[in-house]
Amino acid sequence: MNIRLYNARILTMEPGREVFYGEVWVKNDKIAYVAEQKELAEEWDKSQFPRIAWDIELDCKGNLLMPGFKNAHTHSGMTFLRSMADDLPLDQWLNKQVFPLEAKLTGEDIYELTRLAVLEYLTSGVTSIFDMYLTPDTIAEACLDTGMRCVLVSGLNNFSSSPKQVEEEFLKWNKKNSLISYQLGFHAEYTCSKELLWKVSEMAHHYRTPVYAHISETKKEVEECKARYGMTPPMFLDSLGTVSYTHLTLPTTER
């Protein structure tokens, strides 16, 4: 598909964050040309471009055209839980509100809730998401139907899915579609047995891929992990060879 976006203020993210008036051409899902309006007119007059049959021509009317935002931590199917019991500590919120309600969700529910979330993403300038939730196949279907780029993340835990299922999803979605990819992950240390985390670690080393999880989110989580294993969550997971770290809320000094 050939798309022409013109009459736009363009932010290219080059050093200096320069903004200029111009247009962008997209050919077969790739940006093929970006230029200021004056530069484009001069080159066009010199016939340096073949005449292109555009599938879509969009007048941006002076609005800003820029790379899309990337939301690196989403649970799209949880849109229905927004503002529900936000005043509870995390463990009570999960066990008294989230888990009981999630147990009632069907695949169709998650599909529609993900579509709702994608609507919010797209109208906020978010073009890619990193999504950990139930039924990854359903999330992928919703994202494909709406054109949203998505990295699926397995939310492996003691209560749903299995290492075998996660491995099958990993292999399926990392070769099927350019919009969808898949990364290994688990929900949290406190919802996974030590044996389950060993399996995740083995898969990560076998496929040479990162692992993603919720780690050290609350003081309660840290204290309970220390009681179970004599270590903080990062130290415990490090002892299994499971993860490296992106952001923590309660790291110890050595971490």
Residue ranges of predicted features:
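Alpha-helical scaffold segments that flank or form the walls of functional sites
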Residues: 82-147, 167-176, 246
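Gly/lys/ser-thr-rich phosphate-binding loops in alpha/beta enzymes
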Residues: 19, 29, 33-37, 61, ...
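Single conserved hydrophobic/aromatic residue that forms the stacking wall/gate
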Residues: 247-255
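N-terminal-biased segments
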Residues: 64-100, 207-224, 232-244
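N-terminal metal-binding scaffold of metallo-dependent hydrolase/deaminase domains
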Residues: 1-49
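Metal-coordinating catalytic core of metallo-dependent amide/deamination hydrolases
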Residues: 138-245
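Divalent metal-coordination and catalytic microenvironments
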Residues: 8, 24, 29, 62, ...
